[in-house]
C-alpha cells in the first residue's frame, strides 16, 4: 500500500460564536477560503489532479446542509471534476475525513485529496433540530447526550477536583496566548476577512477566543454549568463555542516527491474506538492505544500529543490513564487546546492535527499523536511521523 503524507495544513483564525468576527461570514466561506488557500500556497499542484474533498461537519443543516463540502468547493471555483463529500463523526469529523482520504490514497483510488472541516456554531447551534429516539433510554442514559454531564461523570470517576480543572483551563489560555505572542500559530493560520465589534470589515489574523486575562480567582468564581447542585465543570473549564475551519493537502508519498513538495508528516497509523456513552470523553484512551499498536509503537515513543480539550474534567482522566500526567507540560497541547481556542465541531480534528504537525516541526519531534473524544462514546486517533 502507498504511504500517505501531509504536504500542507492550515486553518482559519478561531472566532467567537457570540457576536464574533465571523458573525457575518458563512460556513461555506470559511471552507472555500481554505480550499483556495491550499492551492495558492502549492502552485505545483494541478487542481484537476485532485480526486476528492473530504470535509467534516456535524450540524449538516441550514448553511451547512446539502453537502457543504461540494458547495464550498464550487464556491471556491475549484474544477467541477473534483468530487466532494461531507463527513460526520461528530467531534472527530475532520480527523475522520483524513482517515477516509488516507485509505483512498493507500489503496490507489486517489493520488491527491483535500481534507478538512468546518463548524459555524454561531449560525448553526450544536443542538439545532436534534431529536434523539426515545428508545435509546432503554440502553443509554439520557444524560449521555449532554456532554457536560458526561464530563462531570468522568471527572468524578477519576477523582478530578474543581481546582485541578481550573488550573488546567488557566494553563490552556496561558499557553495559547504565549503561542500567539511568540508567533507559533502564524504558520498554520490563514488570515481572512471578518468584521470587528463596530461592524467594519477587517483582516482577522489571530484567534479571537483566547482570554489572556483569565485568572484562577476568576475561574473559581464561576458557577457549575451543567450540575448546579453538585457539579465542578464550569463554562471556564469547558471548550469555548467558536467558528472556524481547518484543511490539509494530502497525497501519496510518490506524488509529493514527483511534484517536489515538502513532506511535512506521514500518516503512520489510524484508529477509532467506542466507549461507554456516559463517559464519552474517555474515547481517546482506547483509540490512542489501538493506533499505537497498529504502528508498532508504545506511548513512550511519542514525543508530542494533541488532545482536544472538550472539558478539563474529560482531558485530565485521559492524560492520567495514558501515563502523561508527569510530562503533561512538556508533551501535551503545547499551544493550549479547545478550552482556549474553542471547539468548532467539524473543524477540530484536522485543526489539532495541524497544530501538532507545526509543533513537531518547531520542536524537532519525530512522532506525534492527535486524538479526541467524540459525543455518545467514541474516540479517534492518528499517529504522525516526520521524515
From Swiss-Prot:
Q: Which catalytic reaction applies to this protein?
A: an acyl-CoA + acetyl-CoA = a 3-oxoacyl-CoA + CoA
> Which GO annotations describe the biological process of this protein?
fatty acid beta-oxidation; phenylacetate catabolic process
- The catalytic site is made up of 91 (acyl-thioester intermediate), 343 (proton acceptor), 373 (proton acceptor)
Q: Does the keyword RNA-binding apply?
A: no
Q: What is this protein called?
A: 3-ketoacyl-CoA thiolase
Q: Which GO terms describe its molecular function?
A: acetyl-CoA C-acyltransferase activity
InterPro entries documented for this protein: FadA (IPR012805), Thiolase (IPR002155), Thiolase-like (IPR016039), Thiolase-like_sf_Thiolase (IPR050215), Thiolase_acyl_enz_int_AS (IPR020615), Thiolase_AS (IPR020610), Thiolase_C (IPR020617), Thiolase_CS (IPR020613)
Q: Look up keyword Cytoplasm and say if it applies.
A: yes
Q: How does it assemble?
A: Heterotetramer of two alpha chains (FadB) and two beta chains (FadA).
EC number, as in UniProt: 2.3.1.16
What is the main EC category here?
transferase
Amino acid at each position: 500500500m502507498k504511504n500517505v503524507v501531509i504536504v500542507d495544513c492550515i486553518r482559519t483564525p478561531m472566532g467567537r460564536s457570540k457576536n464574533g468576527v465571523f458573525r457575518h461570514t458563512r460556513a461555506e466561506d470559511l471552507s472555500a477560503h481554505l480550499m483556495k488557500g491550499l492551492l495558492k500556497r502549492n502552485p505545483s499542484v494541478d487542481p484537476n489532479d485532485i480526486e476528492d474533498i473530504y470535509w467534516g461537519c456535524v450540524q449538516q443543516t441550514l448553511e451547512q446542509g446539502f453537502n457543504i463540502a461540494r458547495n464550498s468547493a464550487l464556491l471556491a471555483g475549484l474544477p467541477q471534476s473534483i468530487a466532494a463529500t461531507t463527513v460526520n463523526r461528530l467531534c472527530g469529523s475532520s480527523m475522520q475525513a483524513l482517515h477516509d482520504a488516507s485509505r483512498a490514497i493507500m489503496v490507489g483510488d486517489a493520488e491527491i485529496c483535500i481534507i478538512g472541516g468546518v463548524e459555524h456554531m454561531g449560525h448553526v447551534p450544536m443542538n439545532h433540530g436534534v431529536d434523539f429516539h426515545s428508545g435509546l433510554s432503554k440502553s443509554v442514559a439520557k444524560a449521555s447526550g449532554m456532554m457536560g454531564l458526561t464530563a462531570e461523570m468522568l471527572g468524578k470517576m477519576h477523582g478530578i477536583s474543581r481546582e485541578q480543572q481550573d488550573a488546567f483551563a488557566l494553563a490552556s489560555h496561558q499557553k495559547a496566548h504565549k503561542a500567539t505572542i511568540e508567533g507559533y500559530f502564524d504558520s498554520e493560520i490563514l488570515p481572512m476577512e471578518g468584521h470587528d465589534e463596530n461592524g467594519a470589515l477587517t483582516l482577522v489574523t489571530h484567534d479571537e477566543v483566547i482570554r489572556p486575562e483569565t485568572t484562577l480567582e476568576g475561574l473559581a468564581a464561576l458557577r457549575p454549568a451543567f450540575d448546579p447542585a453538585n457539579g465542578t465543570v464550569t463554562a471556564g473549564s469547558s471548550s469555548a463555542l467558536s467558528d472556524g475551519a481547518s484543511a490539509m493537502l494530502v497525497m501519496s508519498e510518490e506524488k509529493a516527491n514527483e511534484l517536489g513538495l515538502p513532506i511535512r508528516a506521514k500518516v503512520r497509523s489510524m484508529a477509532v474506538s467506542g466507549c461507554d456513552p456516559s463517559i464519552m470523553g474517555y474515547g481517546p484512551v482506547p483509540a490512542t492505544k489501538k493506533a499505537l499498536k497498529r504502528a508498532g509503537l508504545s506511548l513512550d515513543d511519542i514525543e508530542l500529543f494533541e488532545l482536544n480539550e472538550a472539558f478539563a474534567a474529560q482531558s485530565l482522566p485521559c492524560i492520567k490513564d495514558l501515563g502523561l500526567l508527569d510530562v503533561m507540560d512538556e508533551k501535551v497541547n503545547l499551544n493550549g487546546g479547545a478550552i482556549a481556542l474553542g471547539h468548532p465541531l467539524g473543524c477540530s480534528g484536522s485543526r489539532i492535527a495541524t497544530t501538532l504537525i507545526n509543533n513537531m516541526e518547531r520542536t524537532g519531534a519525530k512522532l506525534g499523536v492527535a486524538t479526541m473524544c467524540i459525543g455518545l462514546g467514541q474516540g479517534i486517533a492518528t499517529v504522525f511521523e516526520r521524515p
